[in-house]
């Protein structure tokens, strides 16, 4: 009741900005996955598009895996160029091709930990090294796998609705 009376921490004037439920779910997901923070959105594409549009602007470049979810591919191929952002699609398992695709205006290296639908496994540790070397942001759609493997079985029922 404190939230509805305006006594809770945070601004919850409109639920589209935030809500106590989203705040607490994000905190629980972050704790569960061993990460600093987690944001909750209504859809995976909502998460992906907002992250990429936050990190990139007109004239920037993204290096992306060529085997990604179709909605993400369509967003990168057809929509984001309207903002002056270009994408190179590469075989993310070939680290030399990844390196060769990086340009001076590249800002993001994008992949899925396990690609949809081909189930190719990205070498996240090596991609992180490349991203650090070139001062890029590594963005990973982790739908099929947890951030940390802390147990043999991890079930996340909100999988399609969370971006951590």
Functional labels for PLM-detected ranges:
Residues 1-46, 71-78:
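Conserved N-terminal alpha-helix of the aminotransferase class I/II PLP-enzyme fold
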């Amino acid at each position: 009741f404190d939230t509805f009376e305006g006594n809770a921490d945070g601004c919850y004037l409109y639920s589209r900005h935030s809500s106590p439920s989203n705040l607490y779910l994000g905190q629980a997901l972050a704790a569960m996955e061993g990460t600093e923070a987690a944001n909750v959105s209504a859809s995976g594409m909502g998460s992906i598009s907002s992250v990429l549009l936050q990190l990139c602007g007109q004239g920037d470049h993204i290096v992306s895996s060529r085997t990604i979810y179709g909605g993400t591919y369509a967003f990168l191929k057809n929509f984001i160029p309207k903002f002056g952002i270009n994408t190179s699609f590469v075989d993310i398992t070939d680290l030399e091709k990844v390196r060769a695709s990086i340009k001076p205006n590249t800002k993001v290296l994008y992949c899925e930990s396990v690609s949809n639908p081909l189930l190719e496994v990205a070498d996240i540790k090596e991609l992180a090294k490349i991203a650090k070397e070139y001062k890029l942001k590594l963005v990973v759609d982790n739908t099929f796998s947890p951030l940390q493997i802390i147990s043999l079985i991890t079930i996340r029922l909100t999988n399609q609705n969370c971006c951590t």
